[in-house]
Amino acid sequence: MPVIDLATTPLREFNRSLHNIQQGSNDLSYEVANPRGSHAVAVGIDGPVVVDVNGSVGYYCAGMNDGGTVTVHGSAGPGVAENMMSGKVVIEGDASQYAGATGRGGLLVIKGNAASRCGISMKGIDIVVHGNIGHMSAFMGQSGHLVVLGDAGDALGDSLYEAKLFVRGTVKSLGADCIEKEMRPEHLQKLAELLEKADVKDVRPEEFKRYGSARKLYNFNIDNADAY
C-alpha cells in the first residue's frame, strides 16, 4: 500500500494520482499521513480506490466521490463528501457544517457529531451519524436517508421533499413542512440495513422516530405564505 506523506507530497499531485489510475492496476489502496487539516483531500475519486487518512482534514474531503472508500481517522471540516455519487466515506471523529451536501448516492458515516446543515439538499445519499446533528439539517432534502443516533437541532427537515429522516434522540424543533410520520415495516427494514452498513451495534430500529415532508409546500398556496 503506497503511503502518501502530505508533509512532502503536494496535495494536488496526490489527488491527480487518484484520478489517473490505470485499468487493471493493483495499487488501489492508499494511506495518507500528515494531512494537517488540508482542504480537498481525496476529491474526485471515480473508481474503487481505498484511502485511509491518518489525521484530521479541512474543507471538502472526498467531495464528488464516485465509487471510492475514504476513511478519515480524525475529524473533517465543512462539506465532507459533498456531491458524493457512490461509494463510502467514514469520519471517525466529528464533521463540521453541511456534511454530505447535495449527495446523490453512497454512504456517509460520521462516528462523532455533525454540525449544522448536515445533508442539506441531499439527493439520494444515505447519511448515518452516531452522535448529534446541528440546526437546519436535511434542509430541502430531496431523497435518501438521514439516520441520527443522538439528538437533532432546530429546524430539522426544513422545506423537505422526499428524504426520510430517522432520529433516535430528541428533536429541538422541526422545520417548515416537516412532520413526524408513521414508522412502517419497510422503514424498519431499511433502517436496520443502514445501521448494519454503518457498523452500529446494540441499537434497534424501533428506538427511532421517522420524520418526513407534509407535502404542503410543494405548490404555492397563499394560505401557507407564512411557512415559506
UniProtKB/Swiss-Prot annotation:
Transmembrane segments: none
Listed Gene3D superfamilies: Glutamate synthase, alpha subunit, C-terminal domain
Domain of life of the source: Bacteria
SUPFAM superfamilies tied to this protein: Alpha subunit of glutamate synthase, C-terminal domain
A Pfam family hit: GXGXG
Family of this protein: Belongs to the FwdC/FmdC family.
Annotated protein name in UniProt: Protein GlxC
Originating organism: Rhizobium meliloti (strain 1021) (Ensifer meliloti)
Gene for this chain: glxC
